[in-house]
Regions:
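Exposed, low-structure sequence patches enriched in small/polar residues
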Residues: 3-7, 11-195
Length: 195
């Protein structure tokens, strides 16, 4: 709804042993759910009513970042977020004699999510670099609205490697893996060569 909304914006970092950083971020704020935001959410969306602005009174994240040797970096993190009017995509559709029509319905509810993850990256000069990331999510919504979680991520993982082929030319390989609450396996695979 309308009115004054307050949210924290606090970031604390503690550096130790020169290459390790422990951090705590406590953030929040509002996010306008306009046409651009909905289109980024899903290009096949339809809504039955105007989407309310999403309000996050708490988005807390704690973690440890480190670079113990040259070229190697890792991060361990966990967090908890509460969002009022969180966006949820749901699969919808209808059948006619001529065709089947499928689209993404967008609904809203209060969403709470706890998450934890790890990220590891390594780079050797300009010759090769790679990264591996993985995050697990545990979502909660208002009782009776669990169906809204069908497309929210339960696990996201990705792998990327870039290697120098010749001077000023690199080959890039990305692999993205996504597990939703009702879709057990989905993956995206990209191969790009750039100059």
């Amino acid at each position: 709804g309308s009115g004054l909304k307050a949210a924290p914006d606090v970031k604390l970092e503690y550096t130790f042993a020169d290459t390790y950083v422990a951090y705590l971020n406590v953030l929040g704020g509002t996010r306008l759910n306009d046409f651009r935001r909905l289109n980024d959410f899903s290009p096949y969306w339809t809504i039955a009513q105007q989407m309310h602005t999403s309000y996050t009174p708490l988005d807390a994240k704690i973690g440890l970042k480190a670079s113990p040797v040259i070229g190697l970096g890792f991060e361990l993190y966990g967090g908890y977020r509460i969002t009022k009017n969180e966006l949820f995509a749901v699969q919808e559709g209808f059948y006619t004699d001529e065709q089947n029509v499928f689209y993404t319905g967008i609904l809203q509810d209060k969403g709470k999510v706890g998450y934890g993850g790890v990220s590891v990256s390594y780079a050797y000069r300009d010759w090769v670099d790679f990264s591996v990331n993985g995050t697990y999510y545990s979502w909660n919504v208002t009782e009776g609205n669990e169906g809204l979680l069908q497309l929210k991520p339960e696990l996201k993982a990705d792998f990327s490697v870039r290697a120098k082929v010749i001077k000023n030319c690199h080959a890039l390989l990305n692999y993205n893996f996504h597990v939703s609450n009702n879709v057990r396996i989905s993956a995206a695979f990209d191969v790009n060569e750039g100059i």
